[in-house]
């Protein structure tokens, strides 16, 4: 009986060992592996809405256009710019702040110091720090009672508009990206440019 039990256990142990070895190193065999791509590339997961390659293309065009105008290129001192919110009038619930964020970082990087931006979105933290200095709670390298918060020379803002068509044949979306640089003193639009992108496809995609 002991010999018979041993003969049964050995094959079962070997089978379990082989199964365990076979399962090691197998990663998502039935799925599609993740592919790392550049932000300006279009992948196989795509829709007719605003995507990363659109954001890169549009903001790159706007940066080149802004830096070429006389108010920036020929300014005696670097103009100070404040970002105003981008209005989204398309059907896509996108993070519209990404446009301003990339515009600002690319302008700072490529302008060679010809433009400056104010961190108005951080005003609460800045005012708190200023008050702490005025109260003597923290050190100050200059007179904390002097008003040093700067005003803007220009506001940079934009609008996204769209037209959509949907039939049994598929979906089509046209998006107009328009941006403006507005003189903060006179309200004059000193610069404006736009980009147009149209896409069509068989299926619609969900955007978050």
Model-predicted regions and their roles:
Residues 1-21:
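Sec-dependent bacterial lipoprotein signal peptides
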Residues 48-59, 92-100, 139, 168-172:
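Solvent-exposed, acidic/flexible segments
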Residues 22-31, 153-201, 205:
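Amphipathic beta-strand/beta-sheet edge segments enriched in Tyr/Trp
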Residues 36-50, 79-89:
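Acidic/histidine-rich, surface-exposed loop or edge segments in extracytoplasmic proteins
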Residues 70-75, 146, 167-169:
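Surface-exposed acidic, glycine-flexible loop patches that form ligand/cofactor-binding
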Residues 60-61, 65-138, 186-192:
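N-terminal segment of the mature soluble domain
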